[in-house]
Amino acid sequence: MEKGNKIIAACITGISIIIFGLILKAGIDNFTNKDRKVTVKGLSEIEIPADRVTWSIAAYETGNDLPSLYGRMTSTVNKVTAFLKEHGIQEEEISVNPPDVDDRVSNRYSNEFIPFNYKLTTRVSVTSRNVDLVKEIIGRQGELISQGIALGGYNSINYEYTGFQDMKPAMMEEAIANAQATAKQFAKNSGSKLHKIITADQGQFSVYSKENDPSIMKIRVVTTITYSLKD
């Protein structure tokens, strides 16, 4: 009887050791698999023509009599707006800023000679979706100078793509797909399989003009995703 009890106890101990070993192995495997991961980046980038442009034309007049100077500035603004309309710009696409008055005498910080007392500067701005037309007119602004209009050195041109928000979902989908493809290739090369997403960064969109052609916009997004791996 005592011998039988010893056999039973030995069997129970053996089975317990086997079960403990299996549990320990599963725990180690789970720990190993949990710790295996890969972090990849996915890119989506496109180039697209701008669909809106804002062109700001700075013009100035100088003189000593402010009322007379204001009259000349009014004439200058009329010439600029007439030039724009003559070349196809619509009335509602044109805006005119009030003139900025620079009192050269009051703002003088030295005894240097100042040939005129006042400088008036104004801006005539064009905001249009006809980007190609505005680009063409920009190339002809020398015609304003030939009319005696003094253009300032602060003319600015700003191109935009207003449909940017509508493109976000498709670009994010492409960036995620590219990240997943990279992760799958990595898993294949390492003899593993792609499991689930651990973390995902939506990524920041950037929109900027090409250096050699500012009217072409580059839209770019990079997403970062970390996947777990399994055997």
Identify the role of each PLM range.
Residues 2-10, 16-231:
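Short, charged, surface-exposed interaction patches
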